[in-house]
Amino acid sequence: MSDASLTKINWQPTASIQTLLKRSKIMAEIRQFFTDRGVLEVETPALSEYSVTDVHLSTFSTEFLSPFAKQAKTLHLITSPEYHMKRLLAAGSSSIFQLCRVFRNEESGKRHNPEFTMLEWYRPHFDMYRLINEVDDLLQQILDCEPIESYSYQFVFQTYVGLDPLSASRAQLVEKARKHGFACEEDENRDTLLQFLFSEIVEANIGQERPTTVYHFPSSQAALAQISSEDHRVAERFEIYYKGLELANGFHELNDAKEQIRRFERDNQLREQMNLPPQPLDMRFLAALKAGIPNCSGVALGVDRLIMLALNANHIQEVMAFGVERA
């Protein structure tokens, strides 16, 4: 390779050094926020024996071959530290947080990079609303923004889509989705329709002036959240949006191992229907649930998007040392 060819290679970072200095200060401020509240910082593996069953997540995988092993072992880069952190909760860690790199084999663009930084924390004895208040405190401190406003999923869906997401027929959802450009079939999965309408219509109308929490997602979208004891049609799950970005996703955490197994198995059934490979269940995580995790709430927050908002950046790679195109 000649020296001339090297001069044509763009080796420079995607973020300016000035931006990286500001990023470092924000990361330190986040850590201080939790230190002041007595929350323990933890580190958990980036590689896991298990993938995830969620049909909306795709992992990066690699093969680990020990010098003494007869065959390679498949390992997956984590999409979230959730399962490992809940194992720490089961072991008695009390309140914990983590700043770590996570990996999703998906799109890359203005708001997405396949490798990004996640802030995740868990608060024993917090209900969903108390945790939302703590997220609000963090956002006001980092972004100097107005306090969060909160609405139920049902309310914002009815307001902007014009249908009740908890009672609308599949035919009504299909008709509305088609009007907004979704080429769906009559038997399209109900949650796929809800998620399309929410992302296409609702998200564009919320969180523009101040951070907005949407809570009580349909129970079919509970993921790892508990079902509401007051209304079994909805889950104790929330998401936070601000200025066109989904910032955080939180749960009043499910702590019933049998119910979690049922949900994982339903995920795998859906994966088969979508011609996706089913995934083995994370037995270590399920064993920890059976051993018992405390009643708690937890949330995952996209740090790069938070920094985008803090620094008025237009592209996620502007706040990363090296985006995927220059990794």
UniProtKB/Swiss-Prot annotation:
Pfam families: tRNA-synt_2 (PF00152)
EC nos: 6.3.2.-
Disulfide cross-links: none
Amino acids binding ATP: R104, N105, E106, N113, E246, L247, G302
Domain of life: Bacteria
A single BP term in Gene Ontology: lysyl-tRNA aminoacylation
Catalyzed reactions: D-beta-lysine + L-lysyl-[protein] + ATP = N(6)-((3R)-3,6-diaminohexanoyl)-L-lysyl-[protein] + AMP + diphosphate + H(+)
GO terms for cellular component: cytosol
GO molecular function annotations of the record: acid-ammonia (or amide) ligase activity; ATP binding; lysine-tRNA ligase activity; tRNA binding
The UniProt record lists the keyword Ribonucleoprotein: no
Binding-site positions, substrate: S80, P81, E82, Y122, E253
Keywords recorded for this protein, A-Z: ATP-binding, Ligase, Nucleotide-binding
SUPFAM superfamilies: Class II aaRS and biotin synthetases
Entry function: With EpmB is involved in the beta-lysylation step of the post-translational modification of translation elongation factor P (EF-P). Catalyzes the ATP-dependent activation of (R)-beta-lysine produced by EpmB, forming a lysyl-adenylate, from which the beta-lysyl moiety is then transferred to the epsilon-amino group of a conserved specific lysine residue in EF-P.
Quaternary structure (record): Homodimer.
PANTHER family: ELONGATION FACTOR P--(R)-BETA-LYSINE LIGASE, LYSYL-TRNA SYNTHETASE
The family this protein is said to belong to: Belongs to the class-II aminoacyl-tRNA synthetase family. EpmA subfamily.
NCBIfam families linked: genX, PRK09350.1
Protein name per UniProt: Elongation factor P--(R)-beta-lysine ligase
Gene field: epmA
